[in-house]
């Protein structure tokens, strides 16, 4: 089992601006040098999606056709624009207003340094990105079109890295817009932050969130063939340490857990879903609250999963899994549980009763175990037990419905090793030190109304989520090393005013 490559068959279109004023020879050089730039970026190995150079854009009609075609082509997940020469910005208006794909403005040039001894007006006319990109940047800003801006010579690895992160965010955006979320049951009773406007979520994120009766999952459970279950158990044996009792007296429990995973996967695939949620209060005739199956959703299938009906976090986990494809680490549901206030070692323990995924990286091989669970009213569930491996500059991301809009909240964190063995804790767990410190992080998180459920990503960090939020047009409040409570509170107040004005009709 392996996650499908979300970048395969996808493209980012590269549009270069100029105008007919410069003549045939200059435009020939523009096309040639543009091809060299795109070839170099593609060869860098830092951008997971192929860049495709399109014919030089020299007129309003040409720009509009380029943008309309990009918007209509499902293989195109984003557009990069660069002005090799001066390109009058009025000719970009109709095209930019027709664009429905993420946009990146690249501010680069073909030459690395000014040719001090030979530069003449022919060179100046041909190489004036510093001129043309300012004209173009003005019109994009005037039109209010969100875009990422990357500045630097195209041979600089940092430039390719920034484009690569943005390309991952573009893939996350496409995954969001094609996402079907399967809810087995509804929200956990009386819980507030996991609720949300599913209709508005489809408008904003493109994700379709719907409910399937738990009885349908029970029927799928009954229909699973024995050979599928046994094949899955062999996969467990290959990837995890297994507690001896699960291969002996408790083998039936392992068989049931594998059967539940098969049923969930079969239903998800049959309905084209890439994220799912369940609720321990609504299990019908299922023998166990699903544990190992949901834990494997991100790591084995690239799907999102969250518990207790929390579809918003499931959406984030799917987006995080797509953005981080091919990188070390991954994405998982996480939940803030307990603080460590020891001076110098202030940290947060995150966990969940069953569903944290090993996709985020583990210190040792995950171990399949069986333990009692005091909620759900079902048989003892089988789950993977592990500790998340240390990782600097990871992030935890929350999505909350704050009445008038969705707010994404992100904290940059360093995942660290625990200070003890945690031998008696029968669930997956992570320890992290939040930036700038525990006190300020927690105060700001509470101030912003952040959820106790988050998506932890150890593959992509802050920049990818910032790019995603910009593409989605969603507020992102970030807590990092520079955050102070006073400034953070002011930023939230400014966001409130901004969105209040923006939502007036």
UniProtKB/Swiss-Prot annotation:
InterPro entries the record matches: Ara_Isoase_C (IPR024664), AraA_central (IPR055390), AraA_N (IPR055389), AraA_N_sf (IPR038583), Fuc/Ara_isomerase_C (IPR004216), Fucose_isomerase_N/cen_sf (IPR009015), Lara_isomerase (IPR003762)
Domain of life: Bacteria
Role: Catalyzes the conversion of L-arabinose to L-ribulose.
GO cellular component: cytosol
E.C. number: 5.3.1.4
Keyword Zinc belongs to the record: no
Gene: araA
Record's protein name: L-arabinose isomerase
Binding-site residues for Mn(2+), renumbered to this chain: 308, 335, 352, 453
HAMAP family in UniProt: Arabinose_Isome (MF_00519)
Pfam families according to UniProt: AraA_central (PF24856), AraA_N (PF02610), Arabinose_Iso_C (PF11762)
Family membership noted in the UniProt record: Belongs to the arabinose isomerase family.
Cofactor note: Binds 1 Mn(2+) ion per subunit.
UniProt KW keywords: Arabinose catabolism, Carbohydrate metabolism, Isomerase, Manganese, Metal-binding
Pathway annotation: Carbohydrate degradation; L-arabinose degradation via L-ribulose; D-xylulose 5-phosphate from L-arabinose (bacterial route): step 1/3
Cofactor: Mn(2+)
NCBIfam families, sorted: PRK02929.1
């Amino acid at each position: 089992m392996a996650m499908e490559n979300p970048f395969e068959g996808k493209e980012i279109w590269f549009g270069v601006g100029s105008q007919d004023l410069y003549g045939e020879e200059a435009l020939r050089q523009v096309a040639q040098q543009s091809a060299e730039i795109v070839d170099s970026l593609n060869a860098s190995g830092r951008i997971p999606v192929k860049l495709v150079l399109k014919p030089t854009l020299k007129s309003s009609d040409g720009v509009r056709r380029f943008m309309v075609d990009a918007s209509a082509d499902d293989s195109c997940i984003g557009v990069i624009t660069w002005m090799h020469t001066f390109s009058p910005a009025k000719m970009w208006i109709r095209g930019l207003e027709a664009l429905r794909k993420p946009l990146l403005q690249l501010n680069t040039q073909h030459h690395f340094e000014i040719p001090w001894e030979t530069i003449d007006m022919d060179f100046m006319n041909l190489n004036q990105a510093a001129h043309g990109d300012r004209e173009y940047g003005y019109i994009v800003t005037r039109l209010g079109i969100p875009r990422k801006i990357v500045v630097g010579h195209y041979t600089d690895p940092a430039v390719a890295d920034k484009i690569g992160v943005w390309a991952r965010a573009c893939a996350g955006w496409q995954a969001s817009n094609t996402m079907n979320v399967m809810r087995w049951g509804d929200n956990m009773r009386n819980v507030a932050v996991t609720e949300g406007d599913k209709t508005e979520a489809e408008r904003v994120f493109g994700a379709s969130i719907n409910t399937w009766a738990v009885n349908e999952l029970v029927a799928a459970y009954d229909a699973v063939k024995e050979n599928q279950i046994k094949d899955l158990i062999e996969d467990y044996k290959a990837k995890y340490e297994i507690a001896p009792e699960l291969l002996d007296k408790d083998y039936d429990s392992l068989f049931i857990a594998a059967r539940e995973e098969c049923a969930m996967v079969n239903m998800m695939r049959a309905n084209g879903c890439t994220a799912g949620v369940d609720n321990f209060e609504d299990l019908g005739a299922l023998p166990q609250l699903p544990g190992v199956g949901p834990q494997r959703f991100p790591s084995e299938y690239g799907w999102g999963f969250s518990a207790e009906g929390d579809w918003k976090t499931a959406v984030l986990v799917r987006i995080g899994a797509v953005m981080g494809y091919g990188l070390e680490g991954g994405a998982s549901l996480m939940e803030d549980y307990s603080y460590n206030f020891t001076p110098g070692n202030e940290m947060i323990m995150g966990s969940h009763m069953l569903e944290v995924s090993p996709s985020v990286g583990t210190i040792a091989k995950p171990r399949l175990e069986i333990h009692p669970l005091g909620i759900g009213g079902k048989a003892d569930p089988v789950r993977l037990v592990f500790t998340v491996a240390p990782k600097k500059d990871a992030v935890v991301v929350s999505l909350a419905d704050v009445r008038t809009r969705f707010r994404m909240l992100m904290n940059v964190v360093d995942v660290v090793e625990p200070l003890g063995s945690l031998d008696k804790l029968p669930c997956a767990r992570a320890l992290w030190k939040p930036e700038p410190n525990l006190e300020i992080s927690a105060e700001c998180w509470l101030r912003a109304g952040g959820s106790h459920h988050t998506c932890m990503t150890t593959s992509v960090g802050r920049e990818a989520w910032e790019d995603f939020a910009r593409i989605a047009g969603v507020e992102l409040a970030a807590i990092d090393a520079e955050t102070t409570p006073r400034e953070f509170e002011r930023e939230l107040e400014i966001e409130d005013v901004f969105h209040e004005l923006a939502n007036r009709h």
